From Swiss-Prot:
Interacts with host PML-4 and PML-5; this interaction promotes efficient subnuclear targeting of E1B-55K to PML nuclear bodies. Interacts with E4-ORF3 protein. Interacts with E4-ORF6 protein. Plays a major role to prevent cellular inhibition of viral genome replication. Assembles an SCF-like E3 ubiquitin ligase complex based on the cellular proteins ELOB, ELOC, CUL5 and RBX1, in cooperation with viral E4orf6. This viral RING-type ligase ubiquitinates cellular substrates and targets them to proteasomal degradation: TP53/p53, LIG4, MRE11-RAD50-NBS1 (MRN) complex, ITGA3, DAXX and BLM. E1B-55K probably acts as the substrate-specific adapter of the SCF-like E3 ubiquitin ligase complex. Contains a PML interaction motif that allows the subnuclear PML localization. Residues 1-27 are annotated as: Disordered. This is E1B 55 kDa protein. It comes from Canine adenovirus serotype 1 (strain RI261) (CAdV-1).
Amino acid sequence: MEQDSDLESGRATNQRPPRVRVRGAGVRGRGRVRRRALSEGQRRSLFRLDDLQLPDSLYVTRALQRDHALEMPRGQVDFSLIEAEERRAGPTDEWYFESVKTYRAKPGDDLQTLIKNYAKISLECGAVYEINSKIVVTGACYIIGNCAVLRANLPVGTAMFEVLNVDVIPSIGFMERIVFSNILFDCRSTTAVVCCISERNTLFHNCVFSGPHMLCLDIRAGAEVRGCHFVGAVCALRSKGLYSVRVRNSIFEKCAFGVVSGSKASISHSMFKDCACCIMLGGQGTIAHSHFMATTCTDTPMNLQLCTCEGNGSHVVPLGNIHFASNREAPWPTFNANVLVRVRLYMGRRRGVFHPKQSTFSMCVIAAPRGVVQRIYLFSVYDATCAILQLGEAGDAATERLCTCGMRHNTPSLRAAYVTDTRIDREINSQDTAEFFSSDEDNL
């Protein structure tokens, strides 16, 4: 017991007195920074998430760590400033489409001057813009139509827009090419005009071309047409030169010429209705998942007699609803999963074998000259009501027809003979096989 009392007394003597924390004037606790001890510049450099005032509807801002750098969005700037900065410092990757300030044009404004100064133009929704003179585009151009109507008051054959490859387009993300979107090109008067002549890569997105346009799009340096509607035009799209053209999700209705391309063309998920010539393809290309339909043969433009020429008119042949011109250097175009109703397909002389896989030929005619019929392969094709004709000249008889080149030529009459030996023998080859199955189809 005495030993225990000695231990207790020793602990009492060795124990430190309790520390009394007095926080008076000028005294600060451990780890606490007194604000008036910092300068004004130091106080401004403190980083607090509450000071950013960011929209935080999902409550994720507070979960950011201190080592994350938050970049505040910059405001929009004028196109002229971006252009001047690139001329001074060279191309960069810091500018994007959303960084360019949009100019809202009103009816009556000088569109050519606005495009040159601002590049990114927005039209009023549903407004009508009278085009009294040709608009020349030399540099960057992005027009947001908002379903505005562009109505031409121009002489016959004059272009509403002429895109020239003159000025350098600044390095702006998603503004690398000329863009026309959501515009209605109207031509109600008797003057047939050209909507656009382009010598630069151009994108036409969700535009409508209505009325008797002489030529809607004259493409000379490649283009992409997406979701557009062509109604009642003489020629909807014509492509020249070595550049390719791409058409997707578009509608061609009651046009004398739909797509006329002398080079490579890619057409997919589009519809051609009552067009005298839906496609005239001079080079190689791809036609897939499209519909070609003729509902009448007596109404305009289906009653037109058309032709196409080779060698400056030295060789002229009648034009089919789908026409593959002779080209001894190019193969047959890829033709997959298309639907043809009352359509005449003309095939010139080319290399290889033509195989329209997974396509439907309903009440259609495939016409080809001598020596080409044997290169048609109808395996996995719905050809129950399809006729194959071999063409040959019928003497000296000829008629004058409108040509794809814009001139008129004397076209020789042709004699046709039915060919049946190219069909698949269904007594030997069963249709209850994987012949008509595609790996791209969903198994529903």
